[in-house]
């Protein structure tokens, strides 16, 4: 029998789903065996996303994370929307680059300019006609219509 609505089988590590564990229904993003891991993973859809190791909840394996009430010290919110309150941290919207997209509290802040939005950045990128920000994880090679994350130096 599935765990919290998940269709996949549950191993001994699932520990069962009690009250307060949340549901793993269809909103879980396709619940499979990887969702039936320790109880921390039986959370709303926002938490069934990549890697969110929460020490207070145990280890969640596979491609699913275990956020929920684990606190803000861990990231792993994936593509959740900014309005999701059950993420470990607010996320940049996956729908595009708007003024709402760059939040300092995001796990991976986006670089949101008219022609650039790199969700894989660990720090905001510099994406303007002539700039090089030392605070960038990998300073961009910035030209009028280009933002290349693999650059180590800027080209003007």
UniProtKB/Swiss-Prot annotation:
Keywords: Keratin, Repeat. Sequence repeats lie at residues 35-38, 41-44, 47-50, 87-90, 121-124, 146-149. It comes from the Eukaryota. Residues 35-149 are annotated as: 6 X 4 AA repeats of C-C-X-P. Interacts with hair keratins. In the hair cortex, hair keratin intermediate filaments are embedded in an interfilamentous matrix, consisting of hair keratin-associated protein (KRTAP), which are essential for the formation of a rigid and resistant hair shaft through their extensive disulfide bond cross-linking with abundant cysteine residues of hair keratins. The matrix proteins include the high-sulfur and high-glycine-tyrosine keratins. Belongs to the KRTAP type 5 family. This is Keratin-associated protein 5-11. The lineage of its organism: Eukaryota, Metazoa, Chordata, Craniata, Vertebrata.
């Amino acid at each position: 029998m599935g765990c919290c609505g998940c269709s996949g089988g549950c191993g001994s590590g699932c520990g069962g789903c009690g009250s307060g564990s949340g549901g793993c229904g269809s909103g879980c993003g396709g619940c499979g065996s990887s969702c039936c891991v320790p109880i921390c993973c039986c959370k709303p859809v926002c938490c069934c996303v990549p890697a969110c190791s929460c020490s207070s909840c145990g280890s969640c394996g596979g491609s699913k994370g275990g956020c929920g009430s684990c606190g803000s010290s861990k990231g792993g919110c994936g593509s959740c929307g900014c309005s999701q309150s059950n993420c470990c941290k607010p996320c940049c919207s996956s729908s595009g680059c708007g003024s709402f997209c760059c939040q300092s509290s995001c796990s991976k802040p986006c670089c949101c300019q008219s022609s650039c939005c790199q969700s894989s950045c660990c720090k905001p990128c510099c994406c303007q006609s002539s700039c090089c920000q030392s605070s960038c994880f990998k300073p961009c090679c910035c030209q009028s219509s280009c933002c290349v994350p693999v650059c180590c130096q800027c080209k003007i």
